[in-house]
Amino acid sequence: MNVFQIRDKLKQRLAHLNVDFKFDREEETLRIYRQDNYKGVTIKLNAIVAKYEVQKEKIIDEIVYYVEEAIAQMDDESIEKMTNIQIMPVIRATSFDKKTKEGHRFIIEKHTAETNIYYALDLGKSYRLIDESMLESLGLTEQQVKEMSLFNIRKLKNEYKTDEVKGNIFYFVNSNDGYDASRILNTKFLDDIYQQCEGEMLVAVPHQDVLVIADIRNKTGYDVMAHLTMEFFTKGLVPITSLSFGYEKGHFEPIFILGKNNKQKRDSNVIQRLEANRKRFNNKK
Protein backbone atom coordinates (compact mmCIF):
# COMPACT_ATOMS: atom_id res chain seq x y z
CA MET A 1 0.00 0.00 0.00
CA ASN A 2 1.51 3.36 -1.05
CA VAL A 3 0.63 7.01 -0.41
CA PHE A 4 -1.61 7.27 -3.47
CA GLN A 5 -3.56 4.14 -2.60
CA ILE A 6 -4.08 5.37 0.96
CA ARG A 7 -5.24 8.73 -0.41
CA ASP A 8 -7.77 7.09 -2.72
CA LYS A 9 -9.01 4.75 -0.01
CA LEU A 10 -9.65 7.65 2.37
CA LYS A 11 -11.42 9.70 -0.31
CA GLN A 12 -13.66 6.75 -1.07
CA ARG A 13 -14.50 6.12 2.59
CA LEU A 14 -15.24 9.83 3.20
CA ALA A 15 -17.20 10.50 0.01
CA HIS A 16 -20.47 10.78 1.98
CA LEU A 17 -19.30 13.96 3.75
CA ASN A 18 -19.80 17.46 2.35
CA VAL A 19 -16.07 18.01 2.06
CA ASP A 20 -13.41 18.73 -0.52
CA PHE A 21 -9.96 17.16 -0.73
CA LYS A 22 -6.57 18.73 -1.44
CA PHE A 23 -3.59 16.44 -2.00
CA ASP A 24 -0.06 17.80 -1.52
CA ARG A 25 2.27 15.53 -3.48
CA GLU A 26 5.46 17.07 -2.09
CA GLU A 27 4.43 16.89 1.58
CA GLU A 28 2.45 13.66 1.05
CA THR A 29 -0.55 15.03 2.93
CA LEU A 30 -4.28 15.05 2.30
CA ARG A 31 -6.31 18.01 3.52
CA ILE A 32 -10.00 17.30 4.08
CA TYR A 33 -12.12 20.40 4.62
CA ARG A 34 -15.76 21.45 4.91
CA GLN A 35 -17.39 23.05 1.87
CA ASP A 36 -19.25 25.68 3.93
CA ASN A 37 -16.50 27.24 6.07
CA TYR A 38 -13.34 25.53 4.70
CA LYS A 39 -12.32 24.24 8.12
CA GLY A 40 -10.78 20.80 8.14
CA VAL A 41 -7.97 18.44 9.01
CA THR A 42 -4.70 17.48 7.34
CA ILE A 43 -3.65 13.83 7.27
CA LYS A 44 0.00 12.77 6.90
CA LEU A 45 -0.30 9.90 4.46
CA ASN A 46 3.25 8.56 4.74
CA ALA A 47 2.72 7.90 8.44
CA ILE A 48 -0.41 5.89 7.67
CA VAL A 49 1.43 3.81 5.05
CA ALA A 50 3.88 2.60 7.71
CA LYS A 51 1.09 1.82 10.18
CA TYR A 52 -0.97 0.04 7.50
CA GLU A 53 1.73 -2.61 7.14
CA VAL A 54 0.96 -3.75 10.69
CA GLN A 55 -2.60 -2.65 11.45
CA LYS A 56 -4.18 -3.03 7.99
CA GLU A 57 -7.79 -1.78 7.80
CA LYS A 58 -7.87 -0.96 11.50
CA ILE A 59 -5.79 2.19 10.98
CA ILE A 60 -8.03 3.26 8.09
CA ASP A 61 -11.10 2.81 10.30
CA GLU A 62 -9.47 4.94 13.02
CA ILE A 63 -8.61 7.74 10.58
CA VAL A 64 -12.10 7.74 9.05
CA TYR A 65 -13.71 7.91 12.49
CA TYR A 66 -11.39 10.74 13.54
CA VAL A 67 -12.11 12.76 10.38
CA GLU A 68 -15.88 12.24 10.58
CA GLU A 69 -16.00 13.46 14.17
CA ALA A 70 -13.65 16.38 13.54
CA ILE A 71 -15.53 17.60 10.46
CA ALA A 72 -18.88 17.36 12.25
CA GLN A 73 -17.63 19.45 15.17
CA MET A 74 -16.18 22.16 12.90
CA ASP A 75 -19.68 23.46 12.26
CA ASP A 76 -19.49 27.18 13.17
CA GLU A 77 -22.71 26.91 15.16
CA SER A 78 -21.74 23.87 17.23
CA ILE A 79 -20.23 25.81 20.17
CA GLU A 80 -23.23 28.12 20.55
CA LYS A 81 -25.52 25.08 20.72
CA MET A 82 -23.64 23.52 23.64
CA THR A 83 -25.25 23.69 27.08
CA ASN A 84 -22.72 21.71 29.15
CA ILE A 85 -19.17 22.90 28.51
CA GLN A 86 -16.40 20.47 29.47
CA ILE A 87 -12.79 21.63 29.11
CA MET A 88 -9.93 19.11 29.19
CA PRO A 89 -6.13 19.38 28.81
CA VAL A 90 -4.34 17.44 26.08
CA ILE A 91 -0.61 16.83 25.68
CA ARG A 92 1.14 17.53 22.39
CA ALA A 93 4.74 17.58 21.15
CA THR A 94 6.42 20.99 21.11
CA SER A 95 6.53 20.71 17.30
CA PHE A 96 2.72 20.60 17.11
CA ASP A 97 0.99 23.52 15.34
CA LYS A 98 0.71 26.70 17.40
CA LYS A 99 -2.08 28.19 15.27
CA THR A 100 -5.13 26.97 13.38
CA LYS A 101 -5.17 26.95 9.58
CA GLU A 102 -7.11 30.22 9.84
CA GLY A 103 -4.28 31.80 11.87
CA HIS A 104 -5.92 31.75 15.31
CA ARG A 105 -3.53 31.07 18.18
CA PHE A 106 -4.17 27.90 20.19
CA ILE A 107 -4.31 28.26 23.97
CA ILE A 108 -1.02 26.64 25.06
CA GLU A 109 0.90 26.17 28.31
CA LYS A 110 4.52 25.00 28.40
CA HIS A 111 4.88 21.62 30.10
CA THR A 112 8.38 20.18 29.53
CA ALA A 113 11.17 20.62 26.98
CA GLU A 114 9.41 17.96 24.88
CA THR A 115 5.72 18.65 25.54
CA ASN A 116 3.14 21.41 25.68
CA ILE A 117 -0.36 21.49 27.14
CA TYR A 118 -3.23 22.36 24.80
CA TYR A 119 -6.83 22.76 25.89
CA ALA A 120 -9.80 21.02 24.35
CA LEU A 121 -13.55 21.38 24.27
CA ASP A 122 -14.85 17.89 25.00
CA LEU A 123 -17.51 16.85 22.49
CA GLY A 124 -18.32 13.37 23.74
CA LYS A 125 -16.81 11.12 21.09
CA SER A 126 -14.14 13.66 20.14
CA TYR A 127 -12.83 17.07 21.13
CA ARG A 128 -11.83 20.36 19.56
CA LEU A 129 -8.65 22.22 20.47
CA ILE A 130 -9.44 25.67 21.84
CA ASP A 131 -8.04 28.71 20.07
CA GLU A 132 -8.32 32.37 21.02
CA SER A 133 -11.24 32.95 18.63
CA MET A 134 -13.39 30.51 20.65
CA LEU A 135 -12.99 32.18 24.05
CA GLU A 136 -15.78 34.72 23.51
CA SER A 137 -18.24 32.04 22.39
CA LEU A 138 -17.31 29.95 25.43
CA GLY A 139 -17.57 32.95 27.74
CA LEU A 140 -14.24 32.08 29.33
CA THR A 141 -10.80 33.63 29.80
CA GLU A 142 -7.55 31.76 29.13
CA GLN A 143 -6.95 31.39 32.86
CA GLN A 144 -10.43 29.97 33.42
CA VAL A 145 -9.89 27.46 30.61
CA LYS A 146 -6.64 26.27 32.20
CA GLU A 147 -8.09 26.02 35.71
CA MET A 148 -11.20 24.14 34.53
CA SER A 149 -9.13 21.65 32.57
CA LEU A 150 -6.87 20.74 35.49
CA PHE A 151 -9.88 20.35 37.76
CA ASN A 152 -11.55 18.04 35.24
CA ILE A 153 -8.49 15.86 34.61
CA ARG A 154 -8.30 15.13 38.34
CA LYS A 155 -11.89 13.85 38.26
CA LEU A 156 -11.12 11.09 35.74
CA LYS A 157 -10.62 7.54 36.92
CA ASN A 158 -7.00 6.42 36.84
CA GLU A 159 -7.36 2.74 36.05
CA TYR A 160 -4.18 0.98 34.97
CA LYS A 161 -2.67 -2.41 34.25
CA THR A 162 0.65 -3.53 35.68
CA ASP A 163 3.36 -5.79 34.33
CA GLU A 164 6.66 -6.96 35.79
CA VAL A 165 9.60 -7.31 33.43
CA LYS A 166 12.89 -8.63 34.83
CA GLY A 167 12.23 -7.18 38.26
CA ASN A 168 10.90 -3.81 37.06
CA ILE A 169 7.26 -2.74 37.47
CA PHE A 170 5.39 -1.01 34.64
CA TYR A 171 2.02 0.71 34.86
CA PHE A 172 -0.08 1.32 31.73
CA VAL A 173 -2.96 3.80 31.59
CA ASN A 174 -4.89 3.07 28.40
CA SER A 175 -8.61 3.82 28.82
CA ASN A 176 -8.93 5.18 25.25
CA ASP A 177 -11.01 8.16 26.36
CA GLY A 178 -8.72 10.61 24.54
CA TYR A 179 -7.06 11.79 27.76
CA ASP A 180 -4.70 8.98 28.77
CA ALA A 181 -1.55 11.05 28.19
CA SER A 182 -3.27 14.01 29.89
CA ARG A 183 -3.23 12.13 33.18
CA ILE A 184 0.44 13.04 33.45
CA LEU A 185 -0.95 16.37 34.74
CA ASN A 186 -2.64 14.69 37.72
CA THR A 187 0.13 15.14 40.27
CA LYS A 188 -1.82 13.39 43.04
CA PHE A 189 -2.08 10.26 40.88
CA LEU A 190 1.64 10.38 40.06
CA ASP A 191 2.58 11.01 43.67
CA ASP A 192 0.53 7.99 44.77
CA ILE A 193 2.47 5.80 42.34
CA TYR A 194 5.73 7.42 43.44
CA GLN A 195 5.07 6.29 47.01
CA GLN A 196 4.85 2.69 45.77
CA CYS A 197 8.11 2.82 43.81
CA GLU A 198 11.19 1.09 45.17
CA GLY A 199 13.48 2.35 42.38
CA GLU A 200 13.56 5.41 40.12
CA MET A 201 10.18 6.48 38.78
CA LEU A 202 9.97 7.23 35.06
CA VAL A 203 6.92 8.40 33.13
CA ALA A 204 6.30 8.59 29.38
CA VAL A 205 3.61 9.87 27.01
CA PRO A 206 4.62 8.32 23.67
CA HIS A 207 1.21 9.05 22.16
CA GLN A 208 -2.15 10.54 23.07
CA ASP A 209 -3.79 7.30 24.17
CA VAL A 210 -1.29 5.92 26.67
CA LEU A 211 0.57 6.93 29.82
CA VAL A 212 3.43 4.66 30.86
CA ILE A 213 4.83 4.76 34.38
CA ALA A 214 7.83 2.66 35.40
CA ASP A 215 9.41 1.67 38.69
CA ILE A 216 12.98 1.08 37.51
CA ARG A 217 14.67 -1.25 39.98
CA ASN A 218 17.67 -2.37 37.94
CA LYS A 219 19.64 -1.34 34.84
CA THR A 220 17.67 -3.61 32.52
CA GLY A 221 14.56 -1.56 33.29
CA TYR A 222 15.92 1.41 31.35
CA ASP A 223 16.30 -0.67 28.19
CA VAL A 224 12.79 -2.07 28.57
CA MET A 225 11.37 1.44 29.03
CA ALA A 226 13.20 2.71 25.94
CA HIS A 227 11.84 -0.16 23.87
CA LEU A 228 8.28 0.34 25.13
CA THR A 229 8.17 4.08 24.53
CA MET A 230 9.59 3.80 21.02
CA GLU A 231 7.14 1.05 20.11
CA PHE A 232 4.16 3.05 21.39
CA PHE A 233 5.46 6.22 19.73
CA THR A 234 5.64 4.63 16.28
CA LYS A 235 2.18 3.07 16.54
CA GLY A 236 0.25 6.02 17.99
CA LEU A 237 -2.30 7.93 15.93
CA VAL A 238 -1.20 11.15 17.65
CA PRO A 239 2.48 10.60 18.62
CA ILE A 240 3.98 12.89 21.27
CA THR A 241 7.52 11.92 22.32
CA SER A 242 9.61 8.76 22.57
CA LEU A 243 11.60 10.16 25.50
CA SER A 244 10.95 9.28 29.14
CA PHE A 245 10.91 11.64 32.10
CA GLY A 246 12.29 11.16 35.56
CA TYR A 247 9.61 12.19 38.08
CA GLU A 248 9.84 13.44 41.63
CA LYS A 249 7.51 15.77 43.57
CA GLY A 250 5.81 17.28 40.52
CA HIS A 251 9.06 17.80 38.61
CA PHE A 252 9.79 16.20 35.23
CA GLU A 253 13.29 15.78 33.86
CA PRO A 254 13.64 14.42 30.29
CA ILE A 255 16.25 11.68 29.97
CA PHE A 256 17.97 9.87 27.14
CA ILE A 257 18.42 6.14 27.49
CA LEU A 258 21.67 5.51 25.65
CA GLY A 259 22.65 2.07 24.42
CA LYS A 260 22.32 -0.84 26.78
CA ASN A 261 21.62 -0.16 30.45
CA ASN A 262 22.61 3.51 30.27
CA LYS A 263 20.74 6.76 30.73
CA GLN A 264 21.66 10.41 30.58
CA LYS A 265 19.71 13.31 32.02
CA ARG A 266 19.27 16.34 29.81
CA ASP A 267 20.74 19.53 31.22
CA SER A 268 19.33 22.96 30.38
CA ASN A 269 22.12 23.76 27.88
CA VAL A 270 21.32 20.65 25.84
CA ILE A 271 17.62 21.47 25.88
CA GLN A 272 18.20 25.05 24.74
CA ARG A 273 20.49 23.91 21.93
CA LEU A 274 17.99 21.32 20.70
CA GLU A 275 15.15 23.84 20.80
CA ALA A 276 17.20 26.40 18.85
CA ASN A 277 18.05 23.83 16.18
CA ARG A 278 14.41 22.75 15.95
CA LYS A 279 13.28 26.36 15.43
CA ARG A 280 15.87 26.93 12.71
CA PHE A 281 14.73 23.77 10.94
CA ASN A 282 11.07 24.80 11.12
CA ASN A 283 11.88 28.26 9.72
CA LYS A 284 13.54 26.68 6.67
CA LYS A 285 10.50 24.56 5.83
From Swiss-Prot:
It comes from the Bacteria. Pfam families: DUF1444. InterPro entries: DUF1444. Belongs to the UPF0354 family. HAMAP family: UPF0354. This is UPF0354 protein SH1179. It comes from Staphylococcus haemolyticus (strain JCSC1435).
